[in-house]
Amino acid sequence: MKAFAATFTTIALAAASLSAQAQSSVQLTGTIDSYAGSMKLAGQQRVASVGSGGLTTSWWGVKGVEDLGGGLKADFNITSFFRADTGTPGRFDADPFFSRDANVGLAGSFGRVSLGRGLAPNFLPTVLTNPFGDSFTVSPLVLHANMTTAAWGTDSLTTASNTGWSNQILYSTPSFGGLRANVHYQFGEQTGSGNKGKKNVGLNLMYSGGPLSLTAFYERAQINNPVSLAVMPTKSNWMVGGSYDFSVAKLYATYGQAKINAQDRENTTYSLGLDIPVSGTPGTFKAAAARTKSEVGNVSGTRTTVSLGYDHFLSKRTDVYAVAMYDRVSMDIPNKSGTSALVGIRHRF
């Protein structure tokens, strides 16, 4: 904890010093999100607690840009997750300190190229096509893609290998009429003839034009992230999604699939979502549902999750929210379903 505090202070002072020398080139930024509630996912016992990351995983860090002239810029991102309920760094105990971002790059008319740890191909398409965004607590789509329960194991998830990749080369294209693409390549850095050449590769596409947004991604992963970076069974996954803003309501939909070749396993997930702005207020009602079918040979199981919520902005940077969630699996086990309810506050800086 002392080391965490010392690191935070050092980086904050450095950012302040650099900002004074080159105005707005370096920024200390982040989000703090805490909630209180009673949580029970399928297969688990009920827990009443204060938690971190109700709608957004809490994070902080430093970002910077230097204008090199001729339209070329250098930039860097060094950002870290933390648990606001305890002040502990990381999303979990073994999480690397700068597990959100640790990369440096060059950007220009050609797009951007960066080296280091950054987003995996699955992240942006997933969070842009569901009303609860990047919530690892109440977004049905994000939960089915990334989060296990006592009744729903890692092999039943639809994300190949975490929402961020280490040892990565990332190329981001400029916008072509509202269409952007990101090409990801993670070196496996493995030795030995059996594991040589193991790697993660992926691509995503995002289109935005007027009320319509479309996304898609593909990943083929052989390297675990973010801790051990060990070789894992080859897993491939893809998803297509979109949203349309009718002004009175915004609709979301996704469909995706994941396969683990060594197990002959196939996981299929689809989701629907809805945002309804409350007229005359800075508030929005949210509803989302996701269903995943996991099949191994002739054996299959399903998971269904539904969330209903309300998000109210007190300012451009601060909002409060309330969410209720239902989670259920089809297997014949104790506690096969669960309900959760929480209220929280989120502040961006």
Residue ranges and their predicted role:
Residues G30-A36, I78-S80, R117, V183-Y185, ...:
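Transmembrane beta-barrel strands of outer-membrane/channel proteins
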Residues M1-S25:
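Cleavable N-terminal export/targeting peptides
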Residues K196-S307:
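Detector for outer-membrane/organellar transmembrane beta-barrel domains
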Residues H312, S337-F349:
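Outer-membrane beta-barrel "beta-signal"
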Residues S24-S38, V47-G188, G197-K199, M206-G210:
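Outer membrane beta-barrel
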Residues L68, L72-A74, F110-S114, G178-A181, ...:
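Repeated loop/turn-to-beta-strand initiation elements of outer-membrane beta-barrel proteins
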Residues T56-W60, R100-L106, W165-I169, K199-L203, ...:
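Hydrophobic, lipid-facing positions within transmembrane beta-strands of outer-membrane proteins
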Residues A36-Q44, F82-T88, P121-P125, E189-S193, ...:
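Gram-negative outer-membrane beta-barrel proteins
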